[in-house]
Amino acid sequence: MLVGLVTFAAIPPIVTGPMIRGPIVFGTTYAGEDVDLTPERVTLVTSDGLELAAHWVHVHEPAAVVVFVSGTHGPSVTAFFGHAAMLAEEGYASLLVELRARGESQGERIGLAYDEVRDVRAAVAHVQTRLAYASVPIVAFGLSLGGATAINAAGVTPAIDGVVSLSAFSSWSEVFVDNMGLPEPFASVQRAFVDLYLGFTYGFDRRDLVPRRQIERLGSRPALLIHSRGDTQVPFASFERLAAHAPAHVETWVREGDAHLVVADGSFLRPWEDEAYASTVMGFLGRHFGR
């Protein structure tokens, strides 16, 4: 019994410790010019003093500003320049934010959607300093850990007017145990030890800062949850938990197969080529934020 508990306690730091060690150096990054954009490079400063690399894609009289954030170890948020180009065609501005400890952004530790909430809040604060974007709705759009961060940030940031989340986890402890494939009651025991590790690492005062709980705080704000049914990185159970806890009006779209990036293979920089995906995202934005 004691040996088993020690094993359960040892697994979270052994597995998660190396995963959260930064900074992450991306093998591939993209430029706005790859999709005929001329972005404005800016630096954001978080409430804990980190400088983050970010890229504006401006449009005239924007219908909304979409703040993009990416995943745990990639891709770089610059992969979303294609999304920004697609959105610009329909009158949406974009702010692409490289999360802490990744690429050109400062930081030494991946925050597992706890610390990264500060990054999204820094983006919101920056948008609010731009006179051209006064009173323009702000939409948080994230992939994987970025999707979890977008949900968490919306839960604690009333200035975020909407959310688009791709392949988000419902909580780190839940996706951790989902990927282990443990049956009950072992899964519950392991989750408890993962939560204990997260408390010591990120603070026990943040135990409610998880997407499954923060999505309940959306109120009437629109949100779109997207996931692939066979996702092997963030299993579909996370999507099911998020959908179960979301307000009734929250929209969902499920892609069959294992597609963690959701967009059809080879089309992430050109998302308009994936017509089903593009129409889902643009339809959601148009219904809630279009002119």
Segments the model singles out, each with a brief description of its role:
Residues 86-106:
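Conserved alpha/beta-hydrolase
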Residues 111-131:
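Alpha/beta-hydrolase active-site loop
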Residues 232-238:
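Conserved alpha/beta-hydrolase "acid-adjacent" motif
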Residues 72-86, 99:
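The serine-hydrolase catalytic nucleophile loop
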Residues 152-204:
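Hydrolase active-site cap/lid region
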Residues 218-219, 225-227, 231:
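Short beta-strand/loop motif that positions the catalytic acidic residue
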Residues 240, 244-291:
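C-terminal catalytic histidine-bearing segment of alpha/beta-hydrolase fold enzymes
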Residues 2-45, 55:
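An N-terminal hydrophobic leader/cap segment in hydrolases
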